[in-house]
Regions:
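Conserved thiamine diphosphate
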Residues: 9, 13-179, 183-186, 203-211
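Single conserved hydrophobic/aromatic residue that forms the stacking wall/gate
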Residues: 1-7, 11
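A generic structural signal for short, well-ordered alpha-helical segments in conserved domains
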Residues: 189-192
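Acidic-enriched catalytic cores of C-N bond-cleaving enzymes acting on peptides and small amides
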Residues: 198
């Protein structure tokens, strides 16, 4: 999916490449470098199985970095939680390690909708207002779960990579820090409830949106 900006006009174009990761990445790079090759600002957004991204087309991701491409790569169905029935090839648990090797790739592993919105807004500002030659890699899940309201004042922490999302303070004696990102964060919240209710141990929950 890509959005092209020409002056004050905006157009939206959808492309479905099929089982053609190399071709899809090539299309994304072409759109992501159109600002310098054709003097046309575009916002390419490429969605794929997260396992079929850096693991299969890591050389193209490097090429995107070398060519100063701008845009968003969305590693969908990440976290090893929902596609086990389709085989191990769909279970991604390490794409962020690969993404971290590219200096101008900014990676995030959000859990909730407001985190994703804050990251997208900042990415658009950095790439298309500040003209930074970077691109974003963001992993998302396809689990069905409730999303909480955005805590006040958390935007800066989301962008920096970590913020406190919940505080389980009841017994005021033992307190531990629980850190989670992406698919595992909701399990951290469940673990905090068990620790407090069954073991009288308080905790703080931190959403780690990025280790990048």
């Amino acid at each position: 999916i890509s959005k092209g900006l020409v002056g004050s006009e905006m157009c939206i174009r959808d492309r479905e490449e099929g089982i053609n990761e190399a071709g899809a990445m090539s299309s994304w790079i072409a759109a992501g470098t159109s600002y310098t090759n054709h003097d046309i600002e575009m916002i390419p957004i490429y969605l794929f199985y997260s396992m079929f991204g850096f693991q299969r087309t890591g050389d193209f991701a490097w090429a995107a970095g070398d060519s100063q491409a701008r845009g968003f790569l969305i590693g969908a169905t990440a976290g090893r939680t929902t596609l086990a029935g389709e085989g191990l090839q769909h279970q991604d648990g390490h794409s962020h390690l690969l993404a971290s090797t590219i200096p101008n790739c900014i990676s995030y592993d959000p859990t909730f909708h407001y985190e994703l919105a804050v990251i997208f807004r900042e990415g658009l500002k950095r790439m298309h207002e500040n003209n930074e030659n970077i691109f974003y890699y963001i992993t998302t899940m396809n689990e069905n779960y409730s999303h909480p309201e955005m805590p006040k004042g958390c935007e800066d922490g989301i962008l920096k990579g970590m913020y406190r999302i919940k505080d389980f303070s009841k017994y005021k004696k033992n307190k531990i820090q629980l850190l989670g990102s992406g698919a595992i964060l909701r399990e951290m919240i469940s673990a905090a409830e068990i620790l407090q209710n069954d073991y009288e141990i308080d905790s703080e929950i931190w959403s780690v949106t990025s280790f990048n």
